[in-house]
C-alpha cells in the first residue's frame, strides 16, 4: 500500500508514478537545481525506477518521497521528501520545485502540508527543514510554511564537495 495522497486544494502530494519520469529528469537539469544538489541528473529511463524506489522507501518506513502535483491537472510541480530519522519521532523535509512552478508558493504549501501530515498523522514530535544560508528563496518558503528558525549549523551542508553553513528550522505540534 502506498503513502496517502494529500491536498490543500491547490497542490497534491502523492507518490511518484512512472509517468512522472520525464518531468523529473527534465527538471533535474535546471542550472539552479544543479547548483544546489549533488545528485547526477537522472535519465528518464532510470527515473522510471523512481516510482519503485519511492514505494520501497515508504514500505521500509524510512521516508515518504512525494511528487508535488497541481491539484487541477495532476501536472508534476516538484518533489518533497519526508525523511524519517533514526531518532524516533523526528523527521526532516526537503523540497525541490521545478523551474516552471517557482515563485507561486508551491514550496511553502508542500512543506506545510507534508509537515502537518507528519505531525498529526504519523505522530511525529518534530519536523525539521534546512536551507543554505545563501538560499533566500528556500529560507522564505520554509518561513512562510510556518517553520521556526532555530539557528545556523556551521559547515553542516555539503554540495559539490564544499561544506557550507545552513539555517535550521523546525515545526512541532504546538506550532500548528
PLM regions and their residue ranges:
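Acyl-donor (CoA/ACP) binding surface of acyl/acetyltransferases
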Residues: 1-32, 65-176
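Hydrophobic residues in alpha-helical segments
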Residues: 28, 37, 58-59
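Conserved GNAT-fold acetyl-CoA-binding loop/helix
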Residues: 32-53
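A generic secondary-structure signal
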Residues: 53-54, 117
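A short helix-loop-beta-strand connector motif used in the catalytic cores of GNAT acetyltransferases and
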Residues: 54-67
Amino acid at each position: 500500500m502506498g503513502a496517502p495522497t494529500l491536498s490543500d486544494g491547490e497542490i497534491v502530494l502523492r507518490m511518484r508514478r512512472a509517468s512522472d519520469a520525464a518531468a523529473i529528469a527534465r527538471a533535474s537539469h535546471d542550472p539552479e537545481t544543479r547548483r544546489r544538489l549533488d545528485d547526477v541528473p537522472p535519465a528518464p529511463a532510470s527515473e522510471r525506477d523512481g516510482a519503485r524506489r519511492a514505494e520501497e522507501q515508504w514500505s521500509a518506513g524510512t521516508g515518504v518521497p512525494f511528487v508535488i502535483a497541481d491539484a487541477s491537472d495532476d501536472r508534476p510541480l516538484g518533489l518533497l521528501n519526508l525523511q524519517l530519522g533514526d531518532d524516533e519521532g523526528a523527521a526532516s523535509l526537503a523540497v525541490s520545485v521545478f523551474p516552471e512552478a517557482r515563485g507561486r508558493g508551491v514550496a511553502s504549501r508542500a512543506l506545510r502540508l507534508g509537515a502537518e501530515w507528519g505531525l498529526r498523522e504519523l505522530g511525529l514530535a518534530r519536523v525539521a527543514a534546512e536551507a543554505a544560508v545563501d538560499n533566500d528563496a528556500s529560507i522564505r518558503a520554509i518561513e512562510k510554511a510556518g517553520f521556526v528558525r532555530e539557528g545556523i549549523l556551521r559547515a553542516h551542508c555539503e554540495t559539490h564537495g564544499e561544506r557550507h553553513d545552513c539555517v535550521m528550522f523546525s515545526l512541532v505540534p504546538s506550532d500548528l
